[in-house]
């Protein structure tokens, strides 16, 4: 747990990048996989990552980001795309927990019922939750 505290307390915001640095696809994939381990409401992972790392894509993103140099200079920029309606994926996402015996049918049904009660018909709330996650 000390490593977690050290990482959180030692983090900094980076604004200057070496524009000649290139990340491998394996490094980009590992970063994305680590991001996917972060907690979300009902573990729905109601967002997707888009890795922007080609010169052409970085140039388009930089133009859309008010020409911030860091967007063009970074080896990769991850765009986080929120997913409205992510709670509808919950039965598929948590079925392995049911099948593995980690939760029983009542807990499975309860989670789905709670998620549907929280999110159904509440587009603004779903959008806000995707941004928060």
Residue ranges and their predicted role:
Residues 1-133:
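Acidic, surface-exposed loops and disordered segments
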């Amino acid at each position: 747990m000390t490593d977690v505290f050290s990482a959180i307390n030692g983090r900094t915001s980076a604004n200057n990048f070496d524009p000649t640095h290139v990340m491998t696809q394996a490094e980009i994939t590992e970063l994305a996989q680590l991001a996917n381990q972060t907690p979300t409401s009902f573990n729905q992972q109601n967002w997707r990552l888009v890795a922007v790392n080609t010169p052409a894509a970085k140039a388009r993103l930089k133009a859309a980001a008010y020409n911030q140099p860091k967007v063009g200079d970074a080896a990769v920029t991850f765009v986080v795309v929120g997913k409205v309606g992510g709670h509808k994926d919950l039965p598929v996402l948590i079925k392995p927990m049911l099948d593995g015996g980690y939760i029983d049918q009542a807990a499975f049904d309860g989670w789905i019922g709670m998620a549907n009660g929280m999110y159904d018909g509440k587009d603004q709330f779903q959008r806000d939750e995707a941004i928060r996650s």
